[in-house]
């Protein structure tokens, strides 16, 4: 009989083991056996909690997306000024948070993006995440720019976030957060000078 309260602990262990396995060997080679071994549980536990490897990958992506949301939210809540510039910078900072730019997270995001082209559930998660970023950026830009310009500026910032993040992920070096923030802040400032 399973111990009461173990489900959240086991799920977290398996998600962390999945991140570690993808970081070390890639998603394709991260087998259920290997992930279970890393988590110190039997293979059957993965089936019990997640159905299969796809279910575990989906849960892992939800975990990363949840941490992304928390990173953005905490920065927005800690702002001392409520200006569009400050709020846009907070959104960017959250997207470049260590929870999203550490090696395991970056490799898992890359695998997720590639897999989302072939998995309807992962594609839906990717679309929700994309829309949330675009919507948050659009709302802030629309506080001081006409709607059409706000949308274009939001696409530009989202493109910079994704592009800088992707270049960082593919470089095999530690992500240069300060450089990414500086480039993105400059773009935001350029857009806001037209307000």
UniProtKB/Swiss-Prot annotation:
Pathway: Amine and polyamine biosynthesis; betaine biosynthesis via choline pathway [regulation]. Transmembrane segments: none annotated. NCBIfam families: betaine_BetI, PRK00767.1. GO terms for biological process: glycine betaine biosynthetic process from choline; negative regulation of DNA-templated transcription. This is HTH-type transcriptional regulator BetI. InterPro entries: BetI_C, DNA-bd_HTH_TetR-type_CS, Homeodomain-like_sf, HTH-type_TetR-like_transc_reg, HTH_TetR, Tet_transcr_reg_TetR-rel_C_sf, Tscrpt_rep_BetI. The gene is betI. It holds the Pfam family TetR_N. HAMAP family: HTH_type_BetI. Keywords: DNA-binding, Repressor, Transcription, Transcription regulation. PANTHER family: HTH-TYPE TRANSCRIPTIONAL REGULATOR BETI, HTH-TYPE TRANSCRIPTIONAL REGULATOR RUTR. Residues 8-68 form the HTH tetR-type domain. It comes from Pectobacterium atrosepticum (strain SCRI 1043 / ATCC BAA-672) (Erwinia carotovora subsp. atroseptica). Repressor involved in the biosynthesis of the osmoprotectant glycine betaine. It represses transcription of the choline transporter BetT and the genes of BetAB involved in the synthesis of glycine betaine. It comes from the Bacteria. Residues 31-50 bind DNA. SUPFAM superfamilies: Homeodomain-like (SSF46689), Tetracyclin repressor-like, C-terminal domain (SSF48498). One of its GO terms (molecular function) is DNA-binding transcription factor activity.
């Amino acid at each position: 009989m399973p111990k009461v309260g173990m489900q959240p602990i086991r799920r977290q262990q398996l998600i962390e083991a999945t991140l570690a396995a993808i970081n070390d060997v890639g998603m394709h080679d991260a087998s259920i056996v290997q992930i279970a071994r890393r988590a110190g549980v039997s293979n059957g536990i993965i089936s019990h909690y997640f159905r299969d490897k796809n279910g575990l990958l989906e849960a892992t992506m939800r975990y990363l997306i949840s941490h992304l949301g928390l990173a953005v939210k905490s920065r927005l809540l800690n702002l001392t000024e409520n200006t569009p510039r400050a709020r846009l910078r907070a959104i960017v900072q959250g997207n470049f948070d260590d929870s999203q730019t550490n090696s395991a997270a970056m490799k898992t995001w890359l695998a997720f993006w590639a897999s989302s082209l072939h998995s309807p559930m992962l594609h839906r998660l990717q679309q929700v995440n994309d829309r949330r970023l675009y919507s948050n950026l659009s709302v802030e830009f629309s506080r001081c720019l006409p709607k059409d310009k706000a949308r274009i500026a939001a696409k530009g910032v989202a493109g910079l976030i994704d592009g800088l993040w992707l270049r960082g992920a593919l470089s095999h070096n530690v992500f240069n957060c300060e450089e990414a923030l500086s480039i993105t802040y400059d773009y935001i400032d350029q857009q806001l000078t037209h307000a």
